Amino acid sequence: MGKRSSTLRVLLLGGTTEASALARLLAADGRFEPTLSLAGVTRAPRPQPIPWRIGGFGGVEGLRRYLAEAGIEALVDATHPFAAQMTRHAIAAAGTLKLLRVERPAWTPCPADHWLPVPDMQAAAQALGPAPRRVLLTIGQKELAPFRETPGHHYIIRSVDPPEPALVPPGAEIITATGPFSLQEERALLARHAIQVIVTKNSGGSATAAKLAAARERGIPVVVMQRPSAPAVERVADAAAAMEWLGAVWERGQGGAAPLEPRLG
């Protein structure tokens, strides 16, 4: 048998810092023919160094059809840790394709932190209690609805794009900003708005972690939505490890014997 094509067609499901880093690595490596797929949550995504598309696939069947029609040979899911449905769709659609999940480690509290873990945003809204508080919401636009049901607090909402007005709690302030945020910036934000509690998701990573350190310094409690249960799929923590995995897939396709060590989580 002869060798197959010298390049490996890769579909990268993105929208995260890790996906952007991996896209840059793939752009510089001639072994791969990558395509980046973005869900379209951000209204004006930054230009990417590899071919890219925006929008959904139409569920599992749509993704399966795309993979077949595009001749994809390896699928890398580097979506947000809370994009559980997309990860499930990727697993269901992959079939016999090589599939890798890139997922940054979750944050873990320090002894001085005052964290309140909750399973969802409904529980987070209830955890704020009845006494009026100044609350910083850094949770994304789709999770705001429960806080409309607890309007007694003053909300400061930080998001990449302005949320839809129908989702915003009455009287809330909107801050549009894109990370990474420095510790100095987060200190200033908490002081300027007299923040008394933060609500966030356990997204992990360094881009928005400084708010946790700033909260620790000021003794501010943080309501933290825990990650959904992770399906069993091969996974790595960053772009560099994903490139190693893709390199091994490419090598095996060329008749090499590079091992693929499963790391199920």
Each model region followed by its residue ranges:
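SAM-dependent methyltransferases
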Residues: 2-77, 84, 94, 99-102, ...
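Conserved N-proximal alpha/beta basic substrate-recognition cap immediately N-terminal to
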Residues: 90
